[in-house]
Amino acid sequence: MSAAGTIKKLGVIGDVHAEHHRLEAALAFLQTMETDAIVCTGDIVDGIGCPNESIKLLDNAAIFTVRGNHDRWILEDKARHIENAHNVTELSEESLSYLTSLPTQVTLNTIRGKLLLCHGVADDDLRKVWPGTDRMGIERSHLLDKIILEGEFQYLINGHMHFRTLIHFEALTLINAGTLRGEHWPGFSVIDFEAENITAFEFRDNQIKRVKTHDLVQEAHTIWADTQSFCGGWDPVTLF
């Protein structure tokens, strides 16, 4: 799926997990930031809040949203044993229609090049990408390597890992959107493509707080050729 228009400023919302109150607050805040568009990495269901309200908010605001693995699972009646899982019977007809119609990928045009929005990597909603740290081993992706090699996209925004970070490749910047869920750095971000930076916001004590701003491209960051060049010992560029 492709979307027309050239984006200068983009709102970025990660995995929702039915946090409809935080989603509503994030959308209202992003409206004040005068973003050209807002994206969401999916996983709308399975959480402590209301999936129908979450879906309605995304739909009414015309947010570019992709399907996450939890959205797929509820439609396939899989993994319903997980904590705070929803049942398909809890979804309205409108919500079912919305989830069924979600794409796995969305292409957007920015003033700095093309951007791919997905949940994991492209159509693989379970794929993780991680250069390797003391707490988590290396996660490589031949599919992402193919995307990098083809050179069509300059940016990729994904979710799934619930860990807002930047991973820099020579020809592409990967931005993990994080999540609205839980108490470990729940939040969202704003990318300013004119200024070439990203600003992170968090929910703290029921308020939205600005956390930090990072340059999208910076020589001090570790820059990889592709995921096969991951070698561990990475110092993550965090957005929290």
What are these regions (language model features)?
Residues 17-22, 46-49, 70-76, 123-125, ...:
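Active-site environment of divalent metal-dependent phosphoester hydrolases
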Residues 2, 6-101:
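Core catalytic region of metal-dependent phosphoesterases/phosphodiesterases
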